[in-house]
Amino acid sequence: PAGLNFSLCGMPHWNSDIGGFFAGHYNKSWNDDSASKNPLYQELYVRWLQFGTFNPMMRSHGTDVYREIYKFGKKGEPVYDAIEKMIGLRYSLLPYIYSTSWEVSNRQSSFMRALMMDFVDDRKVWDINDEYMFGKSILVAPIAHAQYTPEAVVKVSEEEGWSRDGAKKTKTDAAVDFMETKSTNIYLPAGTLWYDFWTNEKHEGGKEITKETTLDVIPLYVKAGSIIPVGPQVQYATEKPWSHLELKVYAGENGNFILYEDEFDNYNYEKGAYTEIPISWNNASRKLTIGARKGAYEGMLKNRKFTVTLQDGTQKSVDYNGKAISVKF
C-alpha cells in the first residue's frame, strides 16, 4: 500500500530496498553469509524482487545479507532461476518502462497506479491495496505472504506494530520444495478483458480468479487493447540498441502506446532531443498502425524492425524507417 499511497499523493518515483535493508536476523550468526541459503529469506527475497521488478526503480539494497544472484545457488536451481527470470524480465521491459517514465515526466502520469485510478466505476477495486497497474497495461498482484515457509514477521496491530519476537522465527533447518505449486486469489477489474501475462489465457473482468503459481511466478495480467514493446536481453540498459523490438498486442479492444526514445544518458531531452512513435491497434479491423516518428536526437535509429505478436502467437515483422506503416492480421 505504501507505494500506491505515494503515487496517489503525486510522488511517483517510489521504491523499496529489495530484501530489506537490515536482514541480519536471517543469518545463523552475525555476518556469516548464511541467509542467502535460508529458505525463509530465499522466499522473502524472491517475492520481494518480483514486486520490485514492477516498481519505478528496481533496487536490491541492504546490509548483513549478500544479494548477488550467485549467493542464492546456481543456474538450474529454483531460487537462482526465479531471480534470473525477474532480472531478465525487467531488462526486456525497458522500452515499456522508459516510455512510461516519459508519460510520468511529461504527461503527469504514474508508474504504480491504484486500481481505482483506471477502473473508478468498479467499486470492488476501491479498497484493493495489494494489486495495482504498472503503467496503464499490466496488472500486478504480488505475492506478499509466505507460501513455502512460515511467516517470519507478524504484524500484531496498527498500534503495537511488528512482533518483537519475530527474530526467533527467521531461521529453519526444514527442507523446502520450491518446485511445489501453490495458488493465490486475484480480482480482475470489470469493464475489460484480461490476459495472463505468462500463459495468454483470457479472463473476463469483474471476477475473482485463482492463479496457480510456483516460486518463479508473480501473477501478472494484461489489459485488452494493450501494446507492450519488448526489448532484447541485455546485461545493462544500453548494451544493445533497440533496433529490433517486439510489439506484444493484446486484442479485444482498441489501444494505443507511444514509444519514447532519447540519448538515454543526459538531459538533452529537456531541450527537445527525443522521439515519439505513436502505435495504435484497431480491434475491429485487426490492424496495427505504427505512426510517423516525431522529433529527433543525435544518434537515433533511422531504421529498425518491429515484430508484432498477438496474444494468440500470430506474428508479423515489418521494417520501419520513420514513416507510418500498418500491419493487418
Q: What feature does the model see in each segment?
A:
Residues 215-324:
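Accessory, solvent-exposed terminal regions and/or long lumenal/extracellular loops of proteins
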Residues 1-216, 222-223:
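Catalytic-domain carbohydrate-binding cleft regions of carbohydrate-active enzymes
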